[in-house]
Protein backbone atom coordinates (compact mmCIF):
# COMPACT_ATOMS: atom_id res chain seq x y z
CA UNK A 1 0.00 0.00 0.00
CA UNK A 2 1.32 3.40 -1.02
CA UNK A 3 1.84 6.00 1.65
CA UNK A 4 -0.18 9.21 1.23
CA UNK A 5 1.67 12.42 2.07
CA UNK A 6 -0.05 15.79 2.35
CA UNK A 7 2.10 18.35 0.54
CA UNK A 8 -0.23 21.37 0.82
CA UNK A 9 -2.94 22.10 3.36
CA UNK A 10 -5.85 24.55 3.11
CA UNK A 11 -3.86 27.50 4.46
CA UNK A 12 -0.94 26.82 2.11
CA UNK A 13 -3.26 26.55 -0.90
CA UNK A 14 -4.76 29.93 -0.02
CA UNK A 15 -1.28 31.45 0.39
CA UNK A 16 -0.23 30.10 -3.02
CA UNK A 17 -3.35 31.55 -4.64
CA UNK A 18 -2.81 34.91 -2.98
CA UNK A 19 0.84 35.05 -4.10
CA UNK A 20 -0.15 34.14 -7.66
CA UNK A 21 -2.90 36.80 -7.57
CA UNK A 22 -0.27 39.47 -6.91
CA UNK A 23 1.84 38.09 -9.77
CA UNK A 24 -1.17 38.19 -12.09
CA UNK A 25 -1.90 41.80 -11.17
CA UNK A 26 1.72 42.75 -11.78
CA UNK A 27 1.72 40.97 -15.15
CA UNK A 28 -1.58 42.62 -16.14
CA UNK A 29 -1.33 46.07 -14.59
CA UNK A 30 -2.37 47.71 -17.88
CA UNK A 31 -5.49 45.55 -18.33
CA UNK A 32 -8.98 46.73 -17.40
CA UNK A 33 -10.57 43.29 -17.61
CA UNK A 34 -9.32 39.71 -17.47
CA UNK A 35 -11.17 36.48 -18.20
CA UNK A 36 -10.24 33.83 -15.63
CA UNK A 37 -11.10 30.49 -17.22
CA UNK A 38 -11.05 27.44 -14.97
CA UNK A 39 -10.91 23.93 -16.36
CA UNK A 40 -13.62 21.82 -14.74
CA UNK A 41 -13.51 20.55 -11.97
CA UNK A 42 -10.44 21.50 -9.88
CA UNK A 43 -9.32 24.34 -12.12
CA UNK A 44 -12.75 25.93 -11.99
CA UNK A 45 -12.89 25.81 -8.18
CA UNK A 46 -9.41 27.38 -8.04
CA UNK A 47 -10.46 30.02 -10.59
CA UNK A 48 -13.49 30.90 -8.44
CA UNK A 49 -11.29 31.40 -5.39
CA UNK A 50 -8.70 33.30 -7.39
CA UNK A 51 -11.32 35.74 -8.72
CA UNK A 52 -12.48 36.37 -5.12
CA UNK A 53 -8.90 37.23 -4.12
CA UNK A 54 -8.30 39.37 -7.21
CA UNK A 55 -11.51 41.33 -6.60
CA UNK A 56 -10.28 42.20 -3.09
CA UNK A 57 -6.90 43.37 -4.38
CA UNK A 58 -7.84 45.29 -7.52
CA UNK A 59 -10.50 47.42 -9.17
CA UNK A 60 -9.98 45.62 -12.48
CA UNK A 61 -12.86 43.53 -13.81
CA UNK A 62 -12.46 39.76 -13.60
CA UNK A 63 -14.86 37.46 -15.46
CA UNK A 64 -15.11 33.86 -14.27
CA UNK A 65 -15.35 31.36 -17.13
CA UNK A 66 -15.94 27.60 -17.07
CA UNK A 67 -14.06 25.36 -19.53
CA UNK A 68 -15.48 21.86 -20.03
CA UNK A 69 -13.32 19.24 -21.77
CA UNK A 70 -13.74 15.80 -23.28
CA UNK A 71 -10.24 14.35 -22.97
CA UNK A 72 -11.41 10.93 -24.13
CA UNK A 73 -12.22 12.20 -27.62
CA UNK A 74 -9.68 11.70 -30.40
CA UNK A 75 -10.51 15.23 -31.53
CA UNK A 76 -10.31 18.30 -29.35
CA UNK A 77 -13.64 18.78 -27.61
CA UNK A 78 -13.71 21.77 -25.31
CA UNK A 79 -16.19 24.53 -24.73
CA UNK A 80 -16.81 27.50 -22.48
CA UNK A 81 -19.93 28.78 -20.77
CA UNK A 82 -19.66 32.07 -22.69
CA UNK A 83 -19.79 32.87 -26.41
CA UNK A 84 -16.30 32.77 -27.93
CA UNK A 85 -16.80 36.29 -29.30
CA UNK A 86 -16.61 37.57 -25.70
CA UNK A 87 -12.90 36.70 -25.64
CA UNK A 88 -11.82 38.53 -28.80
CA UNK A 89 -8.94 40.94 -28.14
CA UNK A 90 -9.08 40.17 -24.43
CA UNK A 91 -6.66 38.79 -21.85
CA UNK A 92 -7.36 35.24 -20.69
CA UNK A 93 -5.94 33.34 -17.73
CA UNK A 94 -6.47 29.57 -17.91
CA UNK A 95 -6.50 27.85 -14.51
CA UNK A 96 -5.80 24.13 -13.89
CA UNK A 97 -5.19 22.30 -10.62
CA UNK A 98 -2.35 19.93 -11.65
CA UNK A 99 -0.08 20.23 -14.68
CA UNK A 100 1.22 16.76 -15.44
CA UNK A 101 1.60 15.73 -19.10
CA UNK A 102 0.06 18.98 -20.34
CA UNK A 103 -2.85 17.36 -22.19
CA UNK A 104 -5.60 19.04 -20.15
CA UNK A 105 -3.99 22.47 -20.36
CA UNK A 106 -3.39 22.04 -24.11
CA UNK A 107 -7.07 21.22 -24.64
CA UNK A 108 -8.03 24.24 -22.53
CA UNK A 109 -5.79 26.49 -24.62
CA UNK A 110 -7.21 24.99 -27.80
CA UNK A 111 -10.59 26.63 -27.20
CA UNK A 112 -9.05 30.05 -27.82
CA UNK A 113 -6.47 29.38 -30.54
CA UNK A 114 -8.65 30.45 -33.48
CA UNK A 115 -9.57 33.75 -31.86
CA UNK A 116 -7.74 37.08 -31.97
CA UNK A 117 -6.64 37.11 -28.33
CA UNK A 118 -4.69 39.93 -26.72
CA UNK A 119 -2.85 37.66 -24.27
CA UNK A 120 -3.17 34.16 -22.78
CA UNK A 121 -1.53 33.10 -19.53
CA UNK A 122 -1.74 29.84 -17.61
CA UNK A 123 -1.87 29.11 -13.90
CA UNK A 124 -1.52 25.78 -12.10
CA UNK A 125 -1.57 25.00 -8.42
CA UNK A 126 0.86 22.08 -8.83
CA UNK A 127 3.32 21.46 -11.68
CA UNK A 128 4.62 17.88 -11.78
CA UNK A 129 7.17 18.57 -14.55
CA UNK A 130 6.21 15.50 -16.65
CA UNK A 131 5.47 17.17 -19.98
CA UNK A 132 4.34 15.27 -23.05
CA UNK A 133 2.80 18.42 -24.57
CA UNK A 134 4.66 21.71 -25.16
CA UNK A 135 2.90 23.84 -22.53
CA UNK A 136 4.12 25.76 -19.51
CA UNK A 137 2.52 27.31 -16.47
CA UNK A 138 3.09 31.06 -16.28
CA UNK A 139 2.01 31.14 -12.62
CA UNK A 140 2.70 28.08 -10.46
CA UNK A 141 1.86 27.45 -6.84
CA UNK A 142 4.21 24.50 -6.33
CA UNK A 143 6.65 22.64 -8.59
CA UNK A 144 7.31 19.08 -7.51
CA UNK A 145 9.40 16.41 -9.18
CA UNK A 146 7.74 13.03 -8.89
CA UNK A 147 8.25 9.65 -10.47
CA UNK A 148 5.64 8.59 -13.03
CA UNK A 149 3.92 6.00 -10.82
CA UNK A 150 3.25 8.60 -8.12
CA UNK A 151 -0.04 10.42 -8.21
CA UNK A 152 -1.00 13.94 -7.12
CA UNK A 153 -4.52 14.38 -5.76
CA UNK A 154 -5.98 17.84 -5.26
CA UNK A 155 -8.96 17.90 -2.92
CA UNK A 156 -10.94 21.14 -3.12
CA UNK A 157 -14.13 21.31 -1.14
CA UNK A 158 -16.55 23.76 -2.74
CA UNK A 159 -16.78 25.64 0.57
CA UNK A 160 -13.02 25.49 1.14
CA UNK A 161 -13.21 23.47 4.36
CA UNK A 162 -11.17 20.33 3.70
CA UNK A 163 -8.66 21.31 1.05
CA UNK A 164 -5.38 19.58 0.49
CA UNK A 165 -2.85 18.39 -2.06
CA UNK A 166 -1.67 14.83 -1.58
CA UNK A 167 1.13 12.71 -3.04
CA UNK A 168 0.55 8.96 -3.35
Predicted regions, residues:
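Active-site-facing substrate-recognition patch
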Residues: 1-32
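Residue-level signature of catalytic and energy-coupling elements of molecular machines
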Residues: 13, 36, 120
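Short, glycine/charge-rich flexible loops or terminal/linker lids adjacent to PRPP-binding catalytic cores
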Residues: 17, 48, 52-91, 103-107, ...
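Internal catalytic or translocation cores that form aromatic/hydrophobic pockets or channels
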Residues: 90-119
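PRPP-dependent phosphoribosyltransferase catalytic core
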Residues: 110-168
Amino acid sequence: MEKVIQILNQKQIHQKLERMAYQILEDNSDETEIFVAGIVRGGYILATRLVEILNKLSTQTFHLVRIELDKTSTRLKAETDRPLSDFENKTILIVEDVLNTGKTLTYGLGVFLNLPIKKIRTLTLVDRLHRLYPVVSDFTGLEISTVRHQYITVVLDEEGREDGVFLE
